[in-house]
A protein has these predicted regions:
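Bacterial Sec-dependent N-terminal signal peptides
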Residues: 1-24
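Low-complexity, Ser/Thr/Pro/Gly-rich disordered linker/stalk regions
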Residues: 17-177, 182-254
Length: 254
């Protein structure tokens, strides 16, 4: 029995040391959406473009748009029905099979245009997580609460909010640059920063930014981020919403 346990331990150690070799992927992607004339053109099975969409209502739509754009001649338009008690309304695109590992810093830059001034409590606009065999490993995502960007963890870690008396609301009916930078750590050595139009609105250090490896044997997580999702990743229960996204940049900075 001791020999068997030692053998298993050695195998697990070998796999852990070779994760990066086994689960390799790019750590850079950018898209200005200029080359697409339809949603179908945006998707590809070879990981050159985006990997998949989430459209959980038949009335939700994603399409290139030329009327409201940040740079160039096109952006992507996301139109979503509101969520309710029966289902979560999603209207988003995701880039999978990327590879950002513990100790690395991932930065996502994107321009957002949220149309209208209606309430959008707990509207989710950007996710980072790890794809696994079934579903996705728990990650983090940006949300609007009281019209202010916050960071929600989908694992056991406190969410990150702007100062209660000094937060900055997200402007509506105009382009807003959002930069989300995360140093990945399964321990309390991570860093989370969010900029809105060049102003630092969230700055947290000594925090956990990846789920612990306890989940690895249960769900297949490997201590990494491999999937980035933008758009209306989960709509509010308050209202139907329209959002435009342009000039997305996903990169490792160190």
């Amino acid at each position: 029995m001791k020999v068997l346990l030692l053998f298993i331990a050695c195998i697990l150690a070998f796999v852990a040391c070779n994760k990066k070799k086994i689960f390799d992927g790019p750590d850079f992607y950018s898209d200005d959406f200029e080359s697409y004339n339809s949603l179908e053109e945006l998707l590809s099975n070879d990981d050159v473009n985006w990997s998949f969409t989430q459209l959980t209502s038949p009335e939700n739509t994603i399409k290139p748009d030329t009327s409201i754009k940040h740079g160039g001649n096109k952006s992507m338009r996301f139109s979503s029905k509101k969520s309710d008690g029966k289902f979560v309304s999603k209207c988003s695109i995701a880039k999978q099979n990327m590879a950002f590992w513990e100790g690395e810093t991932l930065r996502i830059t994107a321009w957002y245009y949220l149309q209208g001034t209606q309430s959008a409590q707990w509207l989710f606009i950007m996710d980072m997580e790890e794809q696994v065999a079934i579903g996705a490993g728990p990650g983090m995502r940006l949300a609007l609460v009281d019209n202010k960007i916050c960071v929600e963890h989908k694992f056991y870690e406190d969410d990150l909010f702007q100062p209660q008396n000094g937060g900055i609301e997200m402007p509506r009916d105009q382009w807003v640059e959002i930069i989300w930078e995360v140093k990945l750590s399964q321990k309390n050595k991570g860093v989370v920063k969010v900029w809105q139009n060049g102003q630092l609105i969230i700055d947290a250090s000594n925090t956990r930014t990846l789920p612990k490896d306890l989940l690895y044997s249960q769900q297949g997580t490997k201590g990494m981020v491999s999937s980035i999702e933008v758009g209306i990743t989960a709509n509010s229960r308050d209202n139907d919403l329209v959002m435009y996204v342009d000039d997305v940049l996903i990169q490792k900075i160190n």
